[in-house]
Amino acid sequence: YLYGTLAIPRFLDITGSRYQMSLFITRQLIVIADDSDFSIRLLQNIRMRKVHQGVNKGRFLFNFVTEFLERDYEILDSMEHTLMSMEEEASQRETENYQEKLMPLRRELLTLRSYYNEMVDFAKNLEENENGYFRKKQISYFDTIEDRADRLMNKTAQLLEYAEQVKDA
């Protein structure tokens, strides 16, 4: 069997507690165990929104992972706008409290970068298909997940660089 654990940040408290989830994958099935109703909510969303909910294990995992990565670009865009506002404040010498706002944002970005790195590794492990649980066609789903997580990680790294520039402003 394949086994993996995921620790997914909660977007209302990125540096706080995470949704903890374990996945057990065998040739026949996928078992998901978590410490909350998070996976149940994901599955309900998939049932409501996806036409191809899980015709095979690869497609199911793709839908499942992309469901919890769904809003990440939105969150990163929001963080970027916050940084742009801070930069504007700094350029107008309204620096009161902006350093206090910047540090938690940088911590959140560092947390997200680490999380996206873990997601890239998770997708690569599935892509390797060591046990032969997935057909060749299904492996492309994991490549897509890896690409998405990699883009999110790169966007996060860019925002960290931007935060550093704002800090120095």
What are these regions (language model features)?
Residues 38-59, 84, 89-93:
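A short, charged helix-loop
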